[in-house]
Amino acid sequence: MATAVQQKIRERGFLDGQFLIAMPSMFDANFARTVIFVCAHSEDGAMGFVLNRPQRLTFPDVLLHLQLLDPDEVIRLPSAAREFQIQAGGPVETGRGFVLHSDDYLSDSSIPVSDDICLTATLDIVKAISRGEGPLKATMLLGYAGWGPGQLENEISSNGWLTCPAREELIFSRDLDEKYDRALALMGISPAMLSSDAGHA
């Protein structure tokens, strides 16, 4: 389902498994105040997922769209499946779904992206979640964020992003509104400190 993306993920780079935290100078509306989990970084570019943008679609909506569920079957879904969170993962290929999840679930198409986080982009995991047999921790993302060769490095050197090691509890937190401030807190930074320092050498 995502061959090119899978190839990128297999090529480990030094930003793999890192958070990108948007600086106030990030004026691109797609990325303002975002936290991004970098899944792949190499000389060919980078890809990752925005972790704090809501998506209007629900998991039952996705199942209906994929014709994996009849409308009269929604009520019979396990509660965890009905409430399973869908997020907007980025502006690239927004019709494609990806599931970031804990490593207790593995299929032939699951790809490790860090020590304890995997990515699966096939229908197998969607079906497993709908049956209540999916991973303990997971979130579905529609679309992803992508950068060409050298693009992300340039944005970081231009103070567009802060970087820090990713934390599993933040990746899977359902409170999207708090993720940005919590990611900054991992670095000992408050939003007030950032805004007051913006524009100063």
From Swiss-Prot:
Sorted alphabetically, which Pfam families does this protein's record hold? Answer: DUF179 (PF02622)
What is this protein called in UniProt?
Answer: UPF0301 protein NGR_c05390
Spell out the InterPro entries in the cross-references.
AlgH-like
- State the HAMAP family in the record: UPF0301 (MF_00758)
Q: Which family does it belong to?
A: Belongs to the UPF0301 (AlgH) family.
| Highest taxon, organism lineage | Bacteria
Record-linked NCBIfam families: PRK00228.1-4
User: Record's Gene Ontology CC terms?
Assistant: cytosol
Tell me which species this is from: Sinorhizobium fredii (strain NBRC 101917 / NGR234)
